[in-house]
């Protein structure tokens, strides 16, 4: 039987990871190793300044105390899968989309990156939400789409080369409004950052980083992950770990 290792950045109690585990249990042997608390926007960070401890919650279900998604994958592969790697690593289902440059912040994508670095086929899965869409529609559509892709991977092989992972984003729509799956590149966003200044009772200043106001120019980017996901499609994007701007190499040589 195929084996799948799952993590996330919303923590072990999140509805998304539990729904995904349940959706895949008849397809493969599923093991969950998730952070003990929410680690959104931790990117591909790993923990080097303190020890990490597995806590078993159920058969095949573990939380890693105060860990990041990348920690979870790193340590699971080093211990549970020391002698035989899983057939697939999935990070998700995230409560919120990871589109465009969100990928660079995303702990969900960070988990998939770690799996890719370790030579395992990996996928990040995220569900867009608008207002109360997750409360209204739940994770049924996301689980159905995810399960179909997993079956395809197991039947036909992982479609990407080494050092590449799949980034899947599901729209915030009910099943009857879902338009289908599109293979598209990552889009480009404009981030208007925000930080709120506060003072504690002793007058010391501190800041909360606010949620950035994000937008993109749809007329210039009609077939990107941002455009299609907000339009009711699921987007599937191949992401590579090589961040080199190859087209700028010669320009940089001439500049030096």
Curated annotation (Swiss-Prot):
GO terms for molecular function: 3'-nucleotidase activity; 5'-nucleotidase activity; exopolyphosphatase activity; metal ion binding; nucleotide binding. GO terms for cellular component: cytoplasm. Nucleotidase that shows phosphatase activity on nucleoside 5'-monophosphates. It catalyses: a ribonucleoside 5'-phosphate + H2O = a ribonucleoside + phosphate. This is 5'-nucleotidase SurE. Keywords: Cytoplasm, Hydrolase, Metal-binding, Nucleotide-binding. It comes from Campylobacter fetus subsp. fetus (strain 82-40). The gene is surE. It holds the Pfam family SurE. Its EC number is 3.1.3.5. It is an enzyme of class 3 (hydrolase).
């Amino acid at each position: 039987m195929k084996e799948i290792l799952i993590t996330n950045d919303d923590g072990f109690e999140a509805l998304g990871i539990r729904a995904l585990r349940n959706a895949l249990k008849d397809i493969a042997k599923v093991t969950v190793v998730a952070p003990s608390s929410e680690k959104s926007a931790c990117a591909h960070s790993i923990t080097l300044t303190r020890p990490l401890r597995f806590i078993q919650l159920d058969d095949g279900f573990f939380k890693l105390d105060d860990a990041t998604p990348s920690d979870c994958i790193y340590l699971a592969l080093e211990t549970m899968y020391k002698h035989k790697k899983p057939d697939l690593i999935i990070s998700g289902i995230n409560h919120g989309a990871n589109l465009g440059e969100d990928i660079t912040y995303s702990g969900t994508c960070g988990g998939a990156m770690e799996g890719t670095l370790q030579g395992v086929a990996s996928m990040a899965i995220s569900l867009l939400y608008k207002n109360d869409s997750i409360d209204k529609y739940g994770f049924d559509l996301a689980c159905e789409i995810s399960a179909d892709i997993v079956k395809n991977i197991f039947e036909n092989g992982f479609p990407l080369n080494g050092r590449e992972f799949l980034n899947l984003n599901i729209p915030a729509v009910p099943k009857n409004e879902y338009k289908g799956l599109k293979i598209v590149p990552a889009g480009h966003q404009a981030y208007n950052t925000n930080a709120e200044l506060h003072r504690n009772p002793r007058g010391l200043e501190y800041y909360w980083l606010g949620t950035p106001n994000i937008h993109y120019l749809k007329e210039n980017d009609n077939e990107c992950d941002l455009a299609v996901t907000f339009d009711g499609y699921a987007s599937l994007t191949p992401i590579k770990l090589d961040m080199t701007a190859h087209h700028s190499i010669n320009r940089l040589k001439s500049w030096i």
